[in-house]
């Protein structure tokens, strides 16, 4: 007997699931394993790819602005010679050349000389003495090598530089004298340095060759007298009292062989009123004691070393 096996009925919810699902089934990718071994080239290529790839989270690089190109002077198409400008020309000149050019211009244009005089700064004592020392150095270098430096031959060899020094001394000295110079300290400082330069003048065997040296002493002595008189009129001669000029002038007179004695006497007369009625004793022991007392009184130190008596008088 043939029996038919009935197929079990399909539940109704199965049909509903089939109806809602997509008619195209999703296919999952399958990885087919290969038996090929990895090579070193593959690893290197993979590593280079990873290193060359920029990360997605790396910050963006902002481009930097390049510096502006320097501007250079454009070369002239036609090269030709031309004279220097005035500033460049003056840079090539030394001091002597500038003095010569300025002197020549002042000689051709007298009005320019007055402008130069009023525009130039006032010469100082140090600058004037330096000029005199330069003339003195030139004089010393002009002496002939060997032989007698006091002979007539040596005098003839150095006559020109000696005259230049004495002329410069005669020109500079009135500039530092009153009334043109109002500061007594400036005048005294210049005379002190100028007298030292006269002391260094050469001595000659022939008396007639020493006339110029003696004349220089006479002129500087008159300058000392003029400055001392003007300084004594101002502030009671305070500049003469505390500058030690009495000792300096006495030393100059000694080096000059007594040719500045008139200036020493003038200084003694100017300071005589501080020594009492006996002004002739200036420079003696009594005069020195009075000067010491005067200095102590004016400086406020008089009587500091005297013991003070305590108790009934």
UniProtKB/Swiss-Prot annotation:
GO terms for molecular function: proteasome binding. Transmembrane segments: none annotated. Pfam families: Cut8 (PF08559). The keyword Secreted does not apply. Keywords: Cytoplasm, Nucleus, Protein transport, Transport. Residues 39-50 have a biased composition (Basic and acidic residues). Residues 16-84 are annotated as: Disordered. It is found in: Cytoplasm; Nucleus. Binds the proteasome. This is Tethering factor for nuclear proteasome sts1. It comes from Neosartorya fischeri (strain ATCC 1020 / DSM 3700 / CBS 544.65 / FGSC A1164 / JCM 1740 / NRRL 181 / WB 181).
